[in-house]
Amino acid sequence: MKIAFLFPGQGSQKIGMGKDLYEKYEEVKKIYQRASEITGIDIATLCFNGIRKDYIGNDYIETNETGEDLIKTENTQIAIATMSLAILEILKKNDINADIATGLSLGEYPALIYGGQLTFEDGINLLKHRGYLMQHKLPKGEYSMLAVIGLESSKIEEICKKLNEEGKFILPANYNYSNQTVVSGDKTAIEEASVIFKENGAKKVVELKTSGPFHTKALEDAKNEYIKELEKVTFNKGNVKVIKNIDGTFYNENDNMQEILAKHIVSPVRFDKVINLMKDEGVDTFVEIGPGKSLTGFIKKELEGVNLINIYDVESLENAIQILK
């Protein structure tokens, strides 16, 4: 069995995520507490109720009140990563490890923490800054993201190029798998492109609930500020191979990690290439750790005869341990 751990990105979050894990496992609770201490945010309340409040050192206090803070980029990134890293603690306790780690967008950070290239403290702190900058350092305007299904990425690139030449702003942002590409841009360009994609044979187009044109040049100001935070961090050699989002290759010891992770904000995510590399490496068991089932869903569309495992609650975690031990 050759295992890859996969860490989800934004869009997979939902209120209540991780609550049963927090209540059952002391190790999970400790990870939430550590992340809360680093960020100053009560991450348990953020995940379980969708409400952001300051962390004052207490355990989670049960409440029926809910809010919409979890969907804000500055909160989503640290919340999803914390849940993923908490689940990892239970897997490690059961001596379940991966040969390869990777993630989608923010998911690359828990992958690097698992791989040993980044400490827990630095990773969570970086995600706090990254989420804040990606939300607050956008050019003025209304933006949107659109998933395009059933149209070749080369055709999508061609349509985007033509619209850009006409003065519109729209670019490919996520190459999820061979048959699905996400584009980012201003709202009017997205609306126009949506019609053109369908006219050119797209089976489906879906507008995504995101707050900005992520993974495009629109985030250049955010990138330039973020690199200052990255330069404060020391990256380690690591002990598990981690695949980069920007080009679908492994990190190596000669890489400039600061430069790559800064570039990550303004570059498309090449998860299609990530899948191809895992296939070439002979991975046969893919374990998605955290909320949602997006990444295993992409792999299911591309690869046959592989094991797909999702871990997002107590039941799925216990089942995974039985399979993987």
Give the predicted meaning of each segment:
Residues 10-12, 37, 41, 58-61, ...:
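Alpha/beta catalytic cores of group-transfer enzymes, especially the acyltransferase/condensing modules
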Residues 1-156, 285-319:
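FabD-like malonyl-/acyl-CoA
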Residues 207-210, 279, 312:
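Short glycine-rich catalytic loops that host catalytic nucleophiles or stabilize transition states
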Residues 163, 320-325:
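Short amphipathic alpha-helix with an adjacent loop that forms part of the alpha/beta core around
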Residues 76-78, 213, 268:
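Glycine-rich phosphate/pyrophosphate-binding beta-alpha loops
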